[in-house]
C-alpha cells in the first residue's frame, strides 16, 4: 500500500510540473496583447464608476457521466483568450486599490491546478499560467473569489448578463461555476429567484444592469480587427474547400451523413477545432426544412438537389456557407430556374451592401427579386403574397458566433452573410413540378469602405461553374470501405 501511495505521489508531481499550456497547441491564436486591447476598448465604452462581470460558459452534460466538448462563452474568450470553464472576469472602468495597496483595473479568477483532475480531463493553466500566458497581472484561483473584497455597493453600475438555468451544482466543489455565481449574487444582493425577472424587465432600483452589456459587446465584436479578419478568411476558405470536394465526390446513392462526413473531414484536415453550428445537409424535400440537422437520409436520389449549409470554426471564428447542387451533376430545367432566381436575388443584395445600409434592407432587396421571379414562374400569383417560399431574412453577422453580435447598420470591417432561398415543400399549392425543390445560396462578406468583398468565392456559385466542378475527379472516388454485412448470395 505504501508503495502504491509513493507511486501515485510521484505521478501527481510529474503532472504538476509538466502540465499547463500544452506544447501541442497551435501558436497562431490571437495574442494576449490583442485580448488586453479588447478589454481596454470595453473599458473605454463603460460609464464612470462601473464594473462589468463575465462568467465562463458552463460545462454541459450529454448523458450520465459524459459531457459535451467544452466551448467557451464567446464574450469571455474575446476578452481573455481563456478556454477553460469555471472562471469569472471583472473589468473596472476606474482603477481600484486592493487591501495590500495594489492598484488594478481588472481581475480574473480561474480554475485551480489539480494534477489528478488534469490526468483525467486535460491540462489547465491555473492562476500563474493566466498571468504568464494571457497577460493578466491580477489572476487568482477560484477559491479566492468568495473572500476577495470588492465593494460592489459603491459602483453606479454593475454590468452582467443574467444567468443560464442549466448550470450544474457540484456539492463537492465550492469553486465550480455554480458556486462562483451564487457567491457573486450574494456580493451584489441579487434578487431572490422569485424576483429575478424584475431585474431585467423593469428599471432597476439598484445598480444592477442586465441590459447594457450586450450593446457594448455588440459594438466591439461587430467590427472586426485585422487579426479577426485573418482568422475568418481561413475559416471561410476551409469551408469552401469542403463544398468543392463534395461537388467532386458526390454520387447518387450516397447518404446525407456521408456528404456531411466529407465536409467535416476537410474541416479537420485543415485543423479547424470545431463546427460553427450543427451541419445542415438536406437532400430533396429535406432541404425545405431550414435548420434540418438530422442528416439521416440513407440514399440520395439521382434527380434531386442537396442543400449543404456548413461552417468550419477556426480558432473560435466560424464561417457560414451554403451551396445547393444537383446530386447527378446536372440541374433540371425547373431546378435551374429556381437556382438562378435565388442567385439573382443574392447578387442584388450584394450590390446594395455598403456602409450605412441596415441589414434588414438586404432582405427587402432579395425578397423583391424573389417575389417578382416567383410570379413570372407561376409559383405565386402576386408579388405581395405571404412569404411561404422565402420565410427568412438574408443576413446576419458572423464571427465568434455563427449569428454574431453586431449593430444593424453596416460599417467597414463587419463580416456578414447574404443568404436568400426558395423552398417549395411537397404538396404545396403550385404545380407539382416544383415540389421538393429547395435552394439556398449563402456567402460570407466583408464590408469595405465602398461596398463589400466576397470572401467565399472559392466555392462555385453559378450553375455553369457548379456543373463544371462536378465533372472534376475526386480523390475520394478511390476510397472504398468494406460492406458491414456481406451481401447475400
Segments and roles (model prediction):
Residues 1-23:
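Bacterial Sec-dependent N-terminal signal peptides
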Amino acid at each position: 500500500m505504501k508503495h502504491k501511495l509513493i507511486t501515485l505521489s510521484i505521478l501527481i508531481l510529474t503532472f504538476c510540473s509538466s502540465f499547463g499550456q500544452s506544447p501541442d497547441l497551435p501558436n497562431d491564436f490571437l495574442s494576449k496583447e490583442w485580448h488586453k486591447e479588447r478589454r481596454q476598448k470595453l473599458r473605454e465604452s463603460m460609464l464612470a464608476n462601473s464594473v462589468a462581470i463575465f462568467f465562463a460558459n458552463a460545462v454541459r452534460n450529454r448523458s450520465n457521466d459524459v459531457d459535451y466538448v467544452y466551448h467557451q462563452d464567446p464574450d469571455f474568450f474575446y476578452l481573455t483568450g481563456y478556454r477553460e470553464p469555471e472562471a469569472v472576469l471583472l473589468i473596472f472602468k476606474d482603477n481600484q486599490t486592493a487591501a495590500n495597496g495594489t492598484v488594478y483595473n481588472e481581475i480574473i479568477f480561474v480554475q485551480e491546478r489539480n494534477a489528478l483532475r488534469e490526468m483525467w480531463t486535460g491540462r489547465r493553466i491555473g492562476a500563474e499560467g493566466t498571468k504568464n500566458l494571457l497577460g493578466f497581472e491580477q489572476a487568482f484561483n477560484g477559491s479566492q473569489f468568495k473572500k476577495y473584497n470588492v465593494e460592489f455597493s459603491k459602483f453606479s453600475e454593475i454590468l452582467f448578463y443574467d444567468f443560464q438555468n442549466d448550470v450544474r451544482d457540484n456539492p463537492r466543489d465550492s469553486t465550480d461555476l455554480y458556486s462562483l455565481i451564487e457567491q457573486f449574487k450574494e456580493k451584489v444582493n441579487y434578487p431572490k429567484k422569485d424576483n429575478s425577472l424584475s431585474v431585467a424587465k423593469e428599471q432597476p432600483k439598484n445598480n444592477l444592469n442586465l441590459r447594457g452589456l450586450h450593446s457594448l459587446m455588440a459594438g466591439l465584436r461587430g467590427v472586426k480587427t485585422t487579426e479577426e479578419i485573418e482568422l475568418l478568411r481561413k475559416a471561410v476558405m476551409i469551408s469552401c474547400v469542403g463544398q468543392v470536394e463534395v461537388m467532386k465526390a458526390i454520387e447518387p446513392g450516397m447518404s446525407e451523413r456521408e456528404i456531411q462526413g466529407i465536409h467535416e473531414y476537410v474541416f479537420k484536415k485543415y485543423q479547424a477545432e470545431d463546427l460553427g453550428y450543427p451541419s445542415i445537409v438536406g437532400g430533396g424535400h429535406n432541404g425545405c426544412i431550414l435548420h434540418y440537422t438530422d442528416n439521416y437520409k440513407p440514399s440520395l436520389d439521382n434527380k434531386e438537389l442537396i442543400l449543404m449549409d456548413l461552417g468550419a470554426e477556426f480558432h473560435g471564428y466560424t464561417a457560414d456557407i451554403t451551396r445547393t447542387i444537383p446530386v447527378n451533376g446536372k440541374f433540371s430545367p425547373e431546378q435551374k430556374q429556381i437556382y438562378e432566381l435565388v442567385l439573382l436575388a443574392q447578387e442584388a443584395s450584394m450590390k446594395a451592401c455598403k456602409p450605412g445600409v441596415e441589414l434588414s434592407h438586404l432582405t427587402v432587396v432579395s425578397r423583391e427579386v424573389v417575389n417578382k421571379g416567383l410570379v413570372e414562374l407561376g409559383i405565386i400569383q402576386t408579388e405581395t403574397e405571404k412569404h411561404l417560399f422565402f420565410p427568412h431574412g438574408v443576413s446576419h453577422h458572423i464571427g465568434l458566433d455563427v449569428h454574431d453580435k453586431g449593430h444593424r447598420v453596416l460599417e467597414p470591417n463587419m463580416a456578414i452573410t447574404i443568404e436568400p432561398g426558395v423552398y417549395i415543400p411537397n404538396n404545396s399549392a403550385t404545380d407539382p413540378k416544383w415540389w421538393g425543390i429547395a435552394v439556398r445560396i449563402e456567402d460570407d462578406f466583408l464590408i469595405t469602405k465602398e461596398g463589400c468583398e466576397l470572401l467565399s468565392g472559392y466555392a462555385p456559385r453559378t450553375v455553369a461553374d457548379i456543373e463544371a466542378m462536378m465533372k472534376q475527379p475526386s480523390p475520394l472516388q478511390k476510397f472504398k470501405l468494406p460492406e458491414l454485412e456481406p451481401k447475400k448470395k
